């Protein structure tokens, strides 16, 4: 399965993609698989696996394996560092945190992780990762110089730089469990310069109204993370959001 081509096909057919993010550190592999299955029943298009505190090793591998046993949608690694790689996944967001002050998150982790990606034949999907205020845990761990919420032009030039460096995707991140999502004005400004390149938006997307606002502003893909770990009926919550962004 070529994951990037698969996601493009969904965009061509449905207009938008929904991604569910599962952090292996937040629950057992078995529970992660149950959440993934419920999300797929709700209409999610792919499962992202990872977290900013860097789940790795056996826990990560077992989580990926259990999820793949339950669902047939793509599994995409979302690593917090080079340790967040698993040869069992279908693809990896091979990303650079462009607004980090720490070179480790800009390039060093990528250098360390590249050989494993090469040897295991995981599909790399190049991505510029941009952390916006408030930033949450990822902003702190990644030592990001947070992009101000009221400065969409700064986000746009970062995204443009990522595009010119050859990255296919740009991810605007407000931080896991953020009180507010990425502002629509920022999403629109970034999508304008990206053109055909794909824009992912995540952080603070907790309901259908917010998801639709982000999608209408220009996001090609919407990520739902924290909320699927909190609600009792994951399938219903995901279905509500998927319906909003694809209608």
UniProtKB/Swiss-Prot annotation:
Catalytic activity: sn-glycerol 1-phosphate + (2E,6E,10E)-geranylgeranyl diphosphate = sn-3-O-(geranylgeranyl)glycerol 1-phosphate + diphosphate
Keyword match Metal-binding: yes
Coiled-coil parts of chain: none
One of the Pfam families matching this protein, by short name: PcrB
Pathway field: Membrane lipid metabolism; glycerophospholipid metabolism
Gene Ontology cellular-component annotations: cytoplasm
GO biological process, one term: glycerophospholipid biosynthetic process
Domain of life: Archaea
Residues engaged in binding sn-glycerol 1-phosphate: 171-177, 203-204, 225-226
Chief place of localization: cytoplasm
SUPFAM superfamilies reported in the protein's UniProt record: FMN-linked oxidoreductases (SSF51395)
Keyword field: Cytoplasm, Lipid biosynthesis, Lipid metabolism, Magnesium, Metal-binding, Phospholipid biosynthesis, Phospholipid metabolism, Transferase
Subcellular location: Cytoplasm
Cofactor field: Mg(2+)
One Gene Ontology MF term: magnesium ion binding
Keyword Calcium recorded: no
Family: Belongs to the GGGP/HepGP synthase family. Group II subfamily.
PANTHER family the UniProt entry points to: GERANYLGERANYLGLYCERYL PHOSPHATE SYNTHASE, IMIDAZOLE GLYCEROL PHOSPHATE SYNTHASE SUBUNIT HISF/H IGP SYNTHASE SUBUNIT HISF/H
Protein name (database record): Geranylgeranylglyceryl phosphate synthase
Species, as recorded: Methanosarcina acetivorans (strain ATCC 35395 / DSM 2834 / JCM 12185 / C2A)
